[in-house]
């Protein structure tokens, strides 16, 4: 029997690279799409048949017919938000019940986790991380401290387990002087979400995914956020609470490392970041504002303005190394169509010394070293084949491939799945 293949798709920057669209483009090549980490703090935006969708917890393969979609054990799930997301998709004619499978080991985001999120941020004052307030961090905290609730718990003495967790959280909130809240209505909707979850296939996803592989099925593992937000390798402490890197696909789905084949790394032709945290190539001038406006750079979940800057090749080399990236996917190339000159950060100056390696701390004393390249000054949004690409843009791709020592396999020139060029 032929063993199926496992490929991984993940972001190489600070998230928002365009993973949702790429998964939707790649899913025809796979039998299974599996989400391996994160929660409803990250939104994957897709445009499908003229309609825009933002997926927060549900894998992006849900639009592709009878593909199996798996929410893995590494994901944290908010039942109320999941219910709202699923019902919106059902209204659009997408039936999730047959094709969506959820790991019983995935952890639940409780209403009090969101309160803890707000309380912890308030207590940090000026040092706050700038979370989305969805309760992600406190949920992963409970997971690591072995006090969390998992989806498998909803079938056995759940009310008792929930009451214990809630009481513990409320004691912490009291110690933080965070007592002005009423979660009655939120809790009611949350419990409705728990009942709604019971309608789906709750599975031991690690067994299911390995059985599917043994049967010869191909699997695409879908990450959320980006490498530079990884809890271990990102710009700590302003990071997320899970492993967004390739290794997270193994621990978040129960897949052995030797099963991993291709690792697709997604990058924008420039760089963005939402919220607080260091960002060496950030632009504070009209150029940054122009990139934001042309790229519609606003958070899919929060609506917050994204900070914009030139592409950072130091951070990208680091991300490619950590993930073992085999192929690059270049997104939002068309956003730079109007620029006379493009800049790329090829090195950092750290305390006066030039380096191509990503340092321990990029908060202070890091100065980007730029190389300028000519812009292509061509509207690429209507281009449908590689041979139509302007020479200056092809030169930009070759420059990236040389700097990053990794081939660019796919180029996106617009938000629709049709605006995608697969290079030979």
Where in the sequence are the language-model features?
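Non-transmembrane, aqueous-exposed alpha-helical and coiled segments at domain scale
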Residues: 1-424
């Amino acid at each position: 029997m032929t063993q199926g293949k496992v490929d991984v798709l993940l972001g190489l920057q600070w998230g928002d690279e365009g993973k949702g669209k790429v998964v939707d483009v790649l899913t025809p090549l796979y039998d299974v799409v599996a989400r391996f980490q994160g929660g409803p703090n990250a939104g994957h935006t897709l445009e499908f048949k003229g309609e825009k969708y933002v997926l927060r917890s549900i894998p992006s393969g849900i639009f592709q017919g009878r593909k199996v979609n798996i929410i893995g054990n590494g994901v944290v799930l908010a039942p109320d938000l999941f219910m709202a997301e699923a019902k919106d998709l059902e209204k659009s004619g997408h039936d999730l019940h047959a094709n969506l499978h959820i790991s019983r080991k995935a952890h639940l985001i409780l209403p009090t986790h969101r309160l803890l999120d707000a309380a912890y941020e308030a207590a940090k004052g000026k040092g706050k991380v700038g979370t989305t307030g969805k309760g992600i961090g406190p949920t992963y905290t409970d997971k690591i401290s072995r006090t969390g609730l998992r989806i498998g718990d909803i079938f056995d003495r759940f009310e008792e387990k929930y009451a214990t967790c809630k009481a513990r959280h409320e004691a912490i909130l009291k110690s933080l002087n965070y007592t002005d809240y009423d979660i009655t209505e939120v809790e009611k909707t949350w419990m409705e979400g728990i009942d709604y979850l019971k309608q789906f296939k709750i599975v031991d996803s690690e067994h299911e995914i390995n059985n599917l592989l043994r049967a010869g099925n191909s699997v695409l593992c879908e990450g959320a956020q980006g490498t530079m937000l990884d809890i271990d390798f990102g710009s700590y402490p302003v990071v997320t609470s899970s492993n967004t890197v390739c290794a997270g696909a193994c621990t978040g789905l129960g897949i052995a490392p030797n099963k991993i084949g291709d690792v697709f790394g997604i990058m924008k032709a420039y760089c963005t970041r939402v919220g607080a945290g260091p960002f060496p190539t950030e632009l504070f001038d009209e150029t940054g504002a122009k990139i934001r406006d042309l790229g519609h750079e606003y958070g899919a979940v929060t609506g917050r303005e994204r900070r914009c800057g030139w592409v950072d090749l130091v951070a990208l080399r680091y991300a490619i190394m950590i993930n073992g990236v085999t192929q690059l996917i270049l997104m939002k190339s068309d956003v730079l169509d109007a620029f006379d000159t493009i800049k790329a950060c090829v090195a950092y100056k750290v305390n006066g010394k030039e380096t191509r390696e990503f340092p321990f701390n990029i908060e202070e004393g890091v100065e980007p070293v730029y190389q300028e390249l000519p812009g292509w000054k061509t509207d690429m949004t209507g281009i449908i084949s590689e041979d139509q690409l302007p020479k200056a843009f092809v030169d930009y791709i070759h420059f990236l491939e040389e700097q990053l020592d990794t081939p660019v396999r796919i180029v996106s020139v617009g938000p629709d799945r049709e605006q995608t060029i697969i290079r030979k």
